[in-house]
From Swiss-Prot:
This is Glutamyl-tRNA(Gln) amidotransferase subunit A. Signal peptide: none annotated. Keywords: ATP-binding, Ligase, Nucleotide-binding, Protein biosynthesis. Pfam families: Amidase. The lineage of its organism: Bacteria, Bacillati, Bacillota, Bacilli, Lactobacillales.
Length: 487
């Protein structure tokens, strides 16, 4: 059994009616993982014994009508802490690290009866766009095993695209949910900054990071988002905003007639031909469904990537100071003194990309360069946020491509950090402004057959409008129904 064509509501109905058991679903997930993961490499750790025990307990107690997520197998990105289950952030410096507590989002899922089947791969400390920066393995794209799944939540996207699970938690600092969703033909939502607690997320850029979902369908994404959203007193950046039922209204009556959609001209520049063709067809389809399409400008988009990498790397250089070999994690051998512990532990424990970003961030924050780099980047961030506000005053959504290309070949860009960074040109600005955005399947390349994603951006705390538009688009196309051919 795969989870292709399945959905949370349907599986829940079967669980309540005892047409299927939580144990059967959980075993099916592990059978599928074992059948595909030698090829794909999505998982870093399996939680099989604990998951089957939890499933048996749910079956014994029975699953009630109001326990929508009970018995549903899902996966967790390995930079989100899980009590007693290794959490490595795909870094040697945290190899074999077992946290003593659960992240808030994991607590909420546990309380809802979700079955965590395991932890999935990522770029080390979520720094990357291809999942090639993991210290442990390179995850492959289920649509073409010679190509990347995107990053940094590549393991999450690959697990969903491979039919291992219906959904997987990811995190998005500059596109790390949306780019993998686009590359793998899945649905990826980065919610508004503050919508979901970051407590228990291993920090990369604290003012950029946000936890979200990768799923096979828009409705499942909406259901799961409602389950993890909300204020958390342990995270001072989480917002005290009411959490709607995001899936309410996602039915046959949903429509987008009269919805005002903005398309930034900057987002339609420099696209591969196949991406441009798919996005233009998607915009025409939205128009045929009753939306109005306006061309607009987000003039500071071109400054987004350099400003983002200065700011996010500066935050990373601070956040990663805690990994020093003293309290937990990897510690180098053959050290002579305390300074030696720090230097050798960090030199041996961090990968090249992490070291590069620490150095960039430290340089940007150093005396004599702070004003020239960090302060200027912070000003650009404010201008980018203002651009979005100006457009969204008169529009319901901003729509465009998620990325400029389809998934690239493994190894094609890893040696050129600058080229890799510019894969994020259409996603980083959203994190700088703290807005919600979702990538949904919009078509396939005629050139290489790879998926192409459409990005929908909304107003702060208005994920509901994004879900509505995404659902209507999804239900009037069949791109989400197509699946890769895996053994």
């Amino acid at each position: 059994m795969t989870f292709y064509g399945k959905d949370i509501s349907g599986l829940h109905a079967d669980l309540v009616a005892k047409k299927v058991s939580a144990t059967e679903l959980t075993k099916a997930a592990f059978d599928r993982i074992k059948a595909t993961d030698d090829q794909v490499g999505a998982f870093l750790a399996l939680n099989e014994e604990a998951a089957l025990k939890q499933a048996a307990e749910l079956d014994q107690a029975g699953i009630a009508e109001d326990q929508l997520l009970a018995g549903i197998p899902l996966a967790v990105k390995d930079n989100i802490v899980t009590k007693g289950l290794t959490t490595t952030a795909a870094s040697k410096i945290l190899e074999n690290f077992k946290p003593v507590y659960d992240a808030t989002v994991v607590e909420k899922l546990n309380a809802a009866g979700v079955i965590n089947v395991g932890k999935v791969n990522l770029d080390e400390f979520a720094m990357g766009s291809s999942t090639e920066n993991s210290a442990f393995k390179t995850t492959k794209n289920p649509w073409d095993l010679t190509r990347v799944p995107g990053g940094s939540s590549g393991g999450s996207a690959a697990a969903v695209a491979a039919g291992d699970v219906l959904g997987a938690l990811g995190s998005d600092t500059g596109g790390s949910i949306r780019i993998p969703a686009s590359f793998t033909g899945t649905v990826g939502m980065k919610p508004t900054y503050g919508r979901v607690s970051r407590w228990g997320l291993i920090a990369f850029g604290s003012s950029f990071d946000q936890i979200g979902w990768l799923t096979q369908s828009v409705k499942d994404n909406a259901i799961l988002m409602s389950a993890i959203a909300g204020k958390d007193d342990r995270d001072m950046t989480s917002a005290n905003q009411p959490v709607p039922d995001f899936a309410a209204g996602l039915n046959d009556q949903a429509d987008i007639k009269g919805m005002k959609i903005a398309v930034p001209r900057e987002y339609m520049e420099g696209l591969d031909d196949d991406v441009q063709e798919v996005i233009e067809a998607s915009l025409k389809h939205l128009e045929s469904l009753g939306a109005t399409i306006d061309e607009v400008s987000l003039p500071h988009t071109k400054y987004g990537v350099p400003a983002y990498y200065i700011l996010a790397s500066s935050e990373a250089s601070s956040n990663l100071q805690r990994f020093d070999g003293i309290r937990y994690g990897f510690r180098a051998d053959d050290v002579k003194n305390l300074e030696d512990v720090y230097v050798k532990t960090r030199s041996q424990g961090f990968g090249d990309e992490v070291k590069l970003r620490i150095m960039l961030g430290t340089f940007s924050l150093s005396a004599g360069f702070y004003d020239a780099y960090f302060n200027k980047a912070a000003k650009v961030r404010r201008l980018i946020a203002q651009d979005f506000d100006d457009v969204l005053k008169d529009h319901d959504l901003i729509v465009g491509p998620t990325g400029t290309s389809t998934a690239f070949k493994i190894g094609a860009e890893i040696a050129d950090p600058k080229q890799m960074y510019f894969n994020d040109v259409l996603t980083v600005t959203l994190n700088m402004a703290g807005l919600p955005g979702m990538s949904i399947p919009a078509g396939f390349s005629k050139d290489n057959g790879m998926p192409i994603g459409l990005q929908m951006i909304g107003k702060r705390f208005d994920e509901a409008t994004i879900y509505k538009a995404g659902y209507v688009f999804e239900q009037t196309t069949d791109f989400h129904k197509q699946t890769p051919e895996l053994g």
